[in-house]
Amino acid sequence: AVDNSDIKIGVSIWSSTDVLGSQCKLILDEAAKALGVQVQYVDQGHVSEKVTASVEQLAAAGCQGIIICNSSDTEMTSAIKTCDDNKVYLSQFFRIISEENSADIYQAAKDSAYYIGAVHEDEPANGEELVNILLNKGDRNIGLIGWEQGDATWLGRWEGYKAGVEKWNADHPDDHTADDGLEGTRLSRDPPPGFL
């Protein structure tokens, strides 16, 4: 039997020091303490090359499991292969592979003996709720900015955002949102100079 103190869990995270990331780290640190396991973090900034390298780094560091917040589905191809090759368990948090838009990657995850799943929110419902909060506060010129092409989480939020805008515009014919929500599409593909 393996002693819990010999178990090391790797965490590939965008940042362990920003507002959300630091809270995630606090929770994971407490869970690791309660279970008596080790935890090791790699901050990857949602840069694709760093995301895939973080999985390789954590596997090489002897982690038996890795939880990852990737920035796009395509990164999961490499992450799954690295974990399969090294017999390291892999799960996602705040992300999910899109069965519809990334069918081959989704299938690779299903076929993997080491990919164990994902924990994520109901992103379409989140997107709709977020746009409704803004609309109810009086905002009409609302844009949604995505981080990385192929991010299934952002695409789910965008789906909910559009649904919320469409419902609002149908229910409020004299009080539409600017550009009927199209501004968000433009911004997500072409952020303003100096934005990032």
For every predicted segment, state its role.
Residues 1-196:
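A residue-level marker of the well-folded mature domains of exported/periplasmic proteins
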